[in-house]
UniProtKB/Swiss-Prot annotation:
S-adenosyl-L-methionine binds at residues 138, 161, 183, 230. InterPro entries: Ribosomal_L11_MeTrfase_PrmA (IPR050078), Ribosomal_PrmA_MeTrfase (IPR004498), SAM-dependent_MTases_sf (IPR029063). This is Ribosomal protein L11 methyltransferase. The lineage of its organism: Bacteria, Pseudomonadati, Pseudomonadota, Alphaproteobacteria, Hyphomicrobiales. Keywords: Cytoplasm, Methyltransferase, S-adenosyl-L-methionine, Transferase. The gene is prmA. The keyword Transferase applies.
Amino acid sequence: MQPSPTHRASFSIGSEAAARRVVDVLTEVFFEGDAAVAAFERPDGQWDVTLHFADAPDQAWLRELVVNSAGNEIADTLAFDTVEAKDWVKASLEDLVPVPAGRFVVHGSHDRDRVAPNKLKIEIEAALAFGTGHHGTTRGCLLLLDHVLKSSRPSNVLDLGTGTGVLAIAAAKALHRAVLASDIDPPSVRVAAENGRLNEVGHHVRVIRATGFAAPDFARAGPFDLVLANILANPLRHLASPMARHLAPGARVILSGLLTHQAPAVIAAYRARGLVPLRHLRIEGWSSLLLRKVG
């Protein structure tokens, strides 16, 4: 007997931030197993969002959901079709080649055996492409982490806004030390913890749900001598003051998730709290910053 086809809904959206927002809504609405949600960036900067269903969805209801979360213009791109039954996540990721970043290589399970043995392998098999290494912000953070590790071995690391957990996993693999990771989004907390276990650093990476630095875990675990935060420009600016309070003297901070034209404002916010910029990487229109706390 032939397996039943998979029902697919897909639409396009104009930015990573907008894609994150709508994917957050979709993953909250659908129970795990009811629908699988994926988002991938195209070469032109647009993001394709797809949902796969075992049973045909209510198209009118789903269109209304997309209108409410992304607007009429985005909903106009919504299309429905059926595809042959297969491991569609694996198929989607087959076009994503391993991404080298210094000593690190981020890859999917389909490329597990293609990575050189002298590299620190980070396997990310998430339903979402945020933080798989194929975005310039993730690669920039990994390159700056590699740079930091050439001259120091941080002993207390925080990955703020961990997403898939890729940065926390990288730090844990390189340092063989405990790393605290946090995210505001419950599905991201779950995915990051799962990825930590997949990469055999689950005993080093502790993932918590938190908004900014509000959770008491940060005060208990700090001060940190390395913080990684790959989020967005506005949250980064607002977090400058609380982050500075949780840093050890001389701590390094790696920031990304900001467009290149947004970097000066972010740098200014952190300079006002006693952090000086050391390096600035620009990849595909995105900036990644390395700063140091003076004192």
